[in-house]
């Protein structure tokens, strides 16, 4: 499942980046063991980050496991917002944005 914010972010990506995103989303959908190369649980949060690397660019998408606390066991995952990781400060800001989106989103 995608929020409008994620769809807007995704629509602006180059095709080669979209291919990497699709590959990572397929891994999340099909694998029972997820490497932190692709997905990482955010400390002290009920959120995860999807990690996509293209050349030297690091893209992140904040995820929420809708129907289970564990993303691997979840059948529904909501992609909240995506961004190009530039700094830790920007990263914290994006997590706050994701939390606001989740709060406003009706599950």
Q: Which sequence ranges carry the predicted segments?
A:
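Basic, Lys/Arg-enriched alpha-helical interface segments
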Residues: 1-58, 69-76, 84-107
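Short conserved beta-strand segments at catalytic cores or DNA/RNA-binding microdomains
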Residues: 64-68
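Conserved catalytic cores of phosphodiester-cleaving nucleases, focusing on short active-site segments
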Residues: 80
